[in-house]
Amino acid sequence: SAEVAGAVIEGAKLTFNVLQ
């Protein structure tokens, strides 16, 4: 669903920020 996709995207952004 759109909600799940949004959560996945937000999680990816957070992970990307942590890895930088």
Curated annotation (Swiss-Prot):
Entry's Gene Ontology molecular function annotations: lipid binding; toxin activity
Bridged cysteine pairs (disulfide): none
Main location: secreted
Protein localization: Secreted; Nematocyst; Target cell membrane
GO BP, one annotated term: killing of cells of another organism
Alphabetical keyword list: Cytolysis, Ion transport, Lipid-binding, Membrane, Nematocyst, Secreted, Target cell membrane, Target membrane, Toxin, Transmembrane, Transport
Site (Part of the hydrophobic cavity (in subunit A) that receives Val-60 from the adjacent subunit (B)): F16
Family: Belongs to the actinoporin family. Sea anemone subfamily.
Summary of the function given for this chain in its UniProt record: Pore-forming toxin (PFT) that consists of a crown-shaped octamer or nonamer that forms cation-selective hydrophilic pores of about 1.5 nm (inside) and 13 nm (outside) and causes cytolysis. It causes cardiac stimulation. Also causes hemolysis (HC(50)=0.4 nM). Interestingly, the Phe-16 is crucial for hemolysis.
Domain remark in the UniProt entry: Composed of a long N-terminal alpha-helix and a core region rich in beta-sheet structures. Before the pore formation, the alpha-helix binds the lipid membrane, partitions into the lipid-water interface and stabilizes the monomeric molecule on the membrane. Finally, it traverses the bilayer, thus forming the transmembrane pore.
Other remarks on this protein: This protein has been found to bind carbohydrates, since it shows a substantial delay in elution profile in size-exclusion chromatography. The carbohydrate pocket ovelaps with the lipid-binding module of actinoporins.
Name the record gives this protein: DELTA-actitoxin-Afr1b
